[in-house]
Design a protein with these regions (language model features):
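Short catalytic micro-motifs in class I SAM-dependent methyltransferases
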Residues: 110-114
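Acceptor-substrate binding/catalytic loop of class I
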Residues: 146-162
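Class I SAM-dependent methyltransferase SAM/SAH-binding core
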Residues: 41-95
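Conserved class I S-adenosyl-L-methionine
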Residues: 1-35, 73, 80-81
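Core SAM-dependent methyltransferase catalytic element
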Residues: 183-205
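A conserved beta-strand element that flanks and buttresses the S-adenosyl-L-methionine
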Residues: 107
Length: 205
């Protein structure tokens, strides 16, 4: 059981999760010409909040997560809501390759900083996107480690220019980025610190 299995049951109770997802989804809809013929993959979907916001703009979304408890939460939400164009996939894309499927759009938010080999996962995204399709990544700008605190083994955000270069290296074009949200996070009893979130968009030529 990983840390996200433990957090799954209370994940949707955090209003920041919803506010952040809505800000990111709205910016995606503004910048990418989504349509009802497009299939999408949300990588590291969590409880699927972003996909639920984007579902009416796309033909179908596959909600992928390697946390079985998060997937159970999504399955339950899909069942209760009666939504027909969302489906879940309990899969670890870091460790395995997804075979015989392609998407027109891959997106993720606040996931990349948990990924060990960022260039490897971007390459996998490229291999999974149809020509003309899009990639959208929302995550933290480089920060001093305060966001997660001691013991975190992932990335303390990203240098946006270096990440853009990595995305370009894997074959994407039309790369653009902008700030899309600010998380005001309590990092101690007396200190609340702002952490800016970027959205980077790229296209598979």
């Amino acid at each position: 059981m990983n840390e996200f299995d433990l957090k799954a049951g209370t994940w949707d109770q955090n209003p920041i999760i919803w506010e952040r997802a809505e800000a990111i989804a709205n910016e995606i809809k503004r910048l990418i010409p989504l349509n009802k013929q497009m299939t999408a993959l949300e990588f590291g979907a969590g409880t699927g909040v972003t996909s639920f916001i984007l579902k009416d703009s796309l033909k179908e979304i596959t909600l992928m997560d390697n946390s079985s408890e998060m997937v159970k939460m999504m399955d339950n939400k899909i069942k209760i809501s009666g939504v027909k164009n969302l489906k879940t996939l309990n899969f670890n894309l870091e460790r395995s390759d997804l075979k015989d499927t392609k998407f027109d759009f891959i997106f993720n938010q606040m996931v990349l900083h948990h990924i060990d080999d960022v260039e490897k996962i971007i390459k996998k995204f490229h291999n999974l996107i149809n020509p003309g399709g899009y990639l959208a990544i929302a995550d933290l700008y480089a920060e001093d480690g305060s966001f997660h605190g001691e013991g975190f083994t992932g990335h303390n955000g990203f240098d946006i220019e270096k990440l853009s270069a990595s995305i370009k290296k894997q074959g994407f074009t039309g790369i653009s980025h902008r700030k899309c949200y600010t998380i005001n996070k309590k990092i101690s009893e007396t200190v609340t610190q702002p952490f800016d979130v970027f959205l980077i968009i790229a296209q598979h030529p």
